Amino acid sequence: MNTGIIDLFDNHVDSIPTILPHQLATLDYLVRTIIDENRSVLLFHIMGSGKTIIALLFALVASRFKKVYILVPNINILKIFNYNMGVAMNLFNDEFIAENIFIHSTTGFYSLNYNDNVINYNGLSRYNNSIFIVDEAHNIFGNNTGELMTVIKNKNKIPFLLLSGSPITNTPNTLGHIIDLMSEETIDFGEIISRGKKVIQTLLNERGVNVLKDLLKGRISYYEMPDKDLPTIRYHGRKFLDTRVVYCHMSKLQERDYMITRRQLCYHEMFDKNMYNVSMAVLGQLNLMNNLDTLFQEQDKELYPNLKINNGVLYGEELVTLNISSKFKYFINRIQTLNGKHFIYFSNSTYGGLVIKYIMLSNGYSEYNGSQGTNPHMINGKPKTFAIVTSKMKSSLEDLLDVYNSPENDDGSQLMFLFSSNIMSESYTLKEVRHIWFMTIPDTFSQYNQILGRSIRKFSYADISEPVNVYLLAAVYSDFNDEVTSLNDYTQDELINVLPFDIKKLLYLKFKTKETNRIYSILQEMSETYSLPPHPSIVKVLLGELVRQFFYNNSRIKYNDSKLLKMVTSVIKNKEDARNYIDDIVNGHFFVSNKVFDKSLLYKYENDIITVPFRLSYEPFVWGVNFRKEYNVVSSP
């Protein structure tokens, strides 16, 4: 990134509509590398650092020269990008061609380019002389989207901007695909990746490191937001390697059915959904069903003496005593004394969703816009509520998040508990979350960071002095109390195989984290910085941000104010051109946010420049139709 741009800002105000200095510095780098040099870039910015706005600002710059195609994982994130495109346009302060920008979900893009599951090669010529931006690039490989991107790269010879907060998902294979997509050479994966018998033994070898450094030199942008504007994280439980884990000791009932499931149903235990299920809760015969939908249709079927299922509804005293779930026993007991909002991650959406719903209802927590809990717990005279986010409710996710993130819900009085499966990706932001729970141990370091990154990010907290509490729950045997202090103690399979499933997953997670961190440090070292005058294509964008910062603190100045002129000439060296720019923003009534007047426009009054507050007003039920194309970004589901 261009550190010369960062040096132009002093005490940047982040609390107003703004482009952050590192975003402008990165934008400069992207314009030079992708547009000027026609080279692909991996934007490896850690979650919460504003990759989306950087990508959209770049798309606006690039739209003057080429067509820009933006691919996002799903329809919900498509909506987020469309909303953020409006934000980016308002901050851009320069010309762009909106008709040249196309935003698609991966499924929508697939339907445009495949006929009967076969790539329409004749149609790919439309992507000549274009730029592709791919959000969450680490997730596109191993499916048709990844295949299509590779074909477009080879056929059209175009550059890619790949966005990722975690370019390694499970193994270095993902990074290998990214290298292949970004470089002009074909990668032989067998040469760069060493494979053992286990996933954790998949490593980027020395040849791979050299290939990485050679092919991606000058193509990596790494950035991690300083944590000075973030709350501290307080991990709960006992020390486990470099973190803390809550040991949830199973009851005899849970341990018995847990062991039956482990022996009878788990041929590849680490990746078997049955172990995810029984580590969360056991449900008797439900554990042994391969088709849960069949059992959901049973009427008054007994799972345990105190637990039955009827047409997919669980009921019975066991939902309160919770011998079926050591994790929920800890969770329910703990939340009674906690204040604030909770975000709870789980991975087994069908089974887990059933368990969560009826345990919560039975223990006095009401479903948001649904059933009321038994003897409901209250907050501010209203029931404490929960919601469960799974892939089955995509259409209502945005509305739910609007409620969860609203200022009125900072205390959780509207919606306190948000349970989410894997549908929630890093593109979503959760605000004012004070408690983060892991009901399922994540598969990868990337996934773990994404879950934390949904909540713990810049601008998500009004008060950063209060910590965020993290609870990593592990279901363990009733007599299990091992101290896990070093990975070196668990290098032999026979030692690992006797461990509880969740503990094994944690160890595998840490083994893979070791390799991930090694590669991330290489990528970080490859990220280049330089100090140059801003690229001509972003001068007006940069000046717009400098002006916003200046007039935040200045409500009224002399027209020939020396500080304003000095600021503008730091970018436009010619004083006459600088004065012309000042004339343009005043006569054009540039929009600013002022600390006294809030939303304001710049005006000339006698020999002064003043900030004039404004408010939009309208008559009820009056519609205005603008026949000019106000918003031309094309999107498809």
From Swiss-Prot:
SMART domains: DEXDc, HELICc
A GO MF label: DNA binding
InterPro entries tied to this protein: DNA/RNA_helicase_DEAH_CS (IPR002464), Helicase/UvrB_N (IPR006935), Helicase_ATP-bd (IPR014001), Helicase_C-like (IPR001650), P-loop_NTPase (IPR027417)
UniProt-annotated location(s): Virion
UniProt motif (DEXH box) ranges: 135-138
Keyword Transcription among record annotations: yes
Keywords: Activator, ATP-binding, DNA-binding, Helicase, Hydrolase, Late protein, Nucleotide-binding, Transcription, Transcription regulation, Virion
This protein's record includes keyword DNA-binding: yes
Binding site for ATP: H45, I46, M47, G48, S49, G50, K51, T52
Main location: virion
Helicase C-terminal domain boundaries: 327-507
Occurrences of domain Helicase ATP-binding (ranges): 32-185
CDD domains in the record: SF2_C
E.C. number(s) listed in UniProt: 3.6.4.-
Ranges that cross the membrane: none
Domain of life: Viruses
Record's function text: Acts with RNA polymerase to initiate transcription from early gene promoters. Is recruited by the RPO-associated protein of 94 kDa RAP94/OPG109 to form the early transcription complex, which also contains the core RNA polymerase. ETF heterodimer binds to early gene promoters.
Subunit organization: Heterodimer of a 70 kDa and a 82 kDa subunit. Part of the early transcription complex composed of ETF, RAP94/OPG109, and the DNA-directed RNA polymerase.
Family (UniProt): Belongs to the helicase family. VETF subfamily.
UniProt-recorded name of the protein: Early transcription factor 70 kDa subunit
Gene source species: Vaccinia virus (strain Tian Tan)
Taxonomy of the source species: Viruses, Varidnaviria, Bamfordvirae, Nucleocytoviricota, Pokkesviricetes
